[in-house]
């Protein structure tokens, strides 16, 4: 009767993985102690994944991407084609490579739980906006593996074109680009 109106109204807009996590955490089994509840780390990873799935539609509004398939803007209904994805740490994080998306330390360092420090971003080529790249904002050197298997160093401020590489070797992690 109005108490949970926003929860009910917005529930369908959220990606399935976040809805599933709330159902798991608030299930009868979890609440009674028969099943373990998600840990703080589980929630942190889940909300990082949720943050990673937010993109800005051409209509100017934010929307969620659906993992592994085309998405539709929750505001205007426009189709958003499935972008390439940076699979970090064997699927721990699947980061859609969409202009404006940030790479955080937890994405590039498999031992880190730092979800706030930005170490890279997806940018558009100013001369050709259809070409996207990963800009290294960190002091670490990344090694971009090209489609033919060669390694190319990507230092601070440098950009690795998304469609020309198949992986990025971070000092303490690996990201595979899935197109």
Question: What are the functions of these language-model segments?
Answer:
Residues 1-41, 45:
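C-terminal lobe helix-coil module of Hanks-type protein kinase domains
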Residues 50, 54-56:
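Conserved helicase/translocase motor-coupling segment
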Residues 56-60, 72-76:
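Short cysteine-rich clusters marking metal-coordination/redox-active sites
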Residues 61-69, 79-82:
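Cys/His-rich microdomains that often coordinate metals
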Residues 82-124:
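N-terminal beta-hairpin/loop module of FHA
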Residues 134-138:
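Asparagine-centered strand-capping/turn motif at beta-strand->loop junctions
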Residues 140-142:
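Short, solvent-exposed loop/linker segments at beta-strand-coil boundaries, enriched for Pro/Gly
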Residues 144-179:
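C-terminal boundary/linker segments immediately following FHA domains
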């Amino acid at each position: 009767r109005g108490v949970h109106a926003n929860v009910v109204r917005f529930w369908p807009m959220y990606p399935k993985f976040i809805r599933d996590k709330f159902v798991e955490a608030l299930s009868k089994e979890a609440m009674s102690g028969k099943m373990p509840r998600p840990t703080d780390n589980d929630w942190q990873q889940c909300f990082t994944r949720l943050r990673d799935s937010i993109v800005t539609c051409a209509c100017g509004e934010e929307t969620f991407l659906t993992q592994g398939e085309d998405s539709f803007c929750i505001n205007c209904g426009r189709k958003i084609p499935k972008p390439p994805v940076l699979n970090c740490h064997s699927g721990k994080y699947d980061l859609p490579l969409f202009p404006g998306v940030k790479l955080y330390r937890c994405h590039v360092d498999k031992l880190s739980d730092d979800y706030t420090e930005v170490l890279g971003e997806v940018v558009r080529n100013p001369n050709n906006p259809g070409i996207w790249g990963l800009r290294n904002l960190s002091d670490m050197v990344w090694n971009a593996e090209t489609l033919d298997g060669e390694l190319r160093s990507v230092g601070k401020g440098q950009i690795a074109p998304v469609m020309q590489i198949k992986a990025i070797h971070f000092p303490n992690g690996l990201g595979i680009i899935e197109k």
